[in-house]
Regions:
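Short, polar/acidic, helix-capping and beta-turn segments at strand->helix junctions
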Residues: 1-228
């Protein structure tokens, strides 16, 4: 929850020298989406956002169908993972922002894969990657959830492993969650069974919450974080 009293930037430093920054910012209500986004991104830059260590940008918007084109145009081409979800900010504004920055990256790669996008942050002994699928074909939430994991199977294989071993966290956004959450859970649990994940082994940390994309027929969207 983004609240008025919460800091807009948090920083962590590890004993091994790793440094991370997390931004959590909400626009002030303005005359238009473009005005709000312009002001929000200026605040983000003033706090040091948008530099080479930017890894993730997630925008929470009030109307992704109408706002997606303007958002892409205004933020420009970025070598970061960019996600957009229809989740209106509680203060009446049209846009809010999460951003994750990782210091000390040896490199960063963003590439288009068939059906989606992968961004890698390279470290000395491992790499972090964020992955998200763009396309869908199944008409229901259970089928779309299975499609998400089938696509992720291929991405994990390209990273040199399997979903059960590499994927640590997923964020799943579900349109009309009252009617589609059951299918989400059935599809996800079926995939976890296929991977052999149990309470005795481990499960992939997973958030399933109300949210929509710019595609009206798309009932689910999943962002995934892995370590390879």
């Amino acid at each position: 929850m983004m609240t008025a009293n919460a800091p807009e930037q948090l920083e962590w430093s590890g004993k091994n020298g790793a440094e991370e920054r997390f931004f959590c910012m909400t626009a002030e209500p303005g005359a238009s989406f473009e005005e709000e986004l312009h002001s929000l991104m200026a605040r983000y830059r003033n706090l040091g956002g948008g530099e080479e260590d930017e890894f993730l940008l997630r925008f929470h918007v009030s109307d992704p169908v109408r706002q997606s084109a303007a958002l892409r145009r205004m933020i420009g081409e970025r070598n970061s993972y960019v996600s957009m979800v229809g989740q209106p900010p509680a203060n009446g504004a049209r846009v809010a922002l999460e951003a994750w920055h990782i210091g000390g990256m040896l490199g960063k790669r963003r590439r288009a894969e068939p059906g989606g996008t992968v961004v890698e942050a390279l470290r000395a002994h491992y790499r972090l990657f964020l992955a998200g699928k763009r396309e869908f074909s199944a008409p229901d939430s259970c089928g779309q959830m299975r499609e998400e994991f089938r696509w992720l199977d291929r991405i994990a294989a390209l990273q040199g492993g399997a979903v059960a071993d590499l994927i640590h966290r997923t964020w799943i956004y579900c349109r009309d969650i009252d009617n589609n959450y059951r299918g989400l859970v059935e599809g996800r649990n079926g995939c976890f069974d296929r991977y052999g994940l149990t309470a005795e082994s481990h499960f992939i940390a997973s958030t399933g919450i109300e949210g929509c994309t710019e595609l009206p027929g798309r009932l689910l969207h999943m962002d995934s974080l892995g370590i390879a």
